[in-house]
Swiss-Prot record:
Gene: ureB
Protein name, entry field: Urease subunit beta
CDD domains, A to Z: Urease_beta
Similarity section: Belongs to the urease beta subunit family.
Subcellular location: Cytoplasm
Pathway this chain belongs to: Nitrogen metabolism; urea degradation; CO(2) and NH(3) from urea (urease route): step 1/1
A GO CC term attached to the entry: urease complex
Keyword terms: Cytoplasm, Hydrolase
Species of the source: Bradyrhizobium sp. (strain ORS 278)
Domain of life: Bacteria
SUPFAM superfamilies for the chain: Urease, beta-subunit
């Protein structure tokens, strides 16, 4: 074995299997790029991102952990969100929830 070596089985890994998802259209109305990480509570993202925030409450981007999506100024794109898991309690971020969802 070599330090850091990976042994990967054949097949595919399905991320977030069985969780509720929703696809929403997001527009960056600001004049700067906005990047959102994989586990950021999407409901609480930068106010320059315009989308149906009610649909995004309790959701995060449905992308691999540690990755992000970048929204360029004036750009509109569809993104898929996935429900937060665990105890479904949100603290920090912009401070809009601070507790149970």
């Amino acid at each position: 074995m070599i330090p850091g070596e990976l042994f990967i089985q054949d097949g595919e890994i399905e991320l977030n299997a069985g969780r509720k998802t929703v696809t929403i259209s997001v527009a960056n109305t600001g004049d700067r790029p906005i990047q959102v990480g994989s586990h950021y509570h999407f409901f609480e993202t930068n106010p320059a991102l315009k989308f149906d925030r009610k649909k995004a409450r309790g959701m995060r981007l449905d992308i691999a952990a540690g990755t992000a999506v970048r929204f360029e100024p004036g750009q509109t794109r569809d993104v898929q969100l996935v429900a937060l898991a665990g105890k479904r309690m949100v603290y920090g971020f912009r401070g809009d929830v601070m507790g149970k969802l």
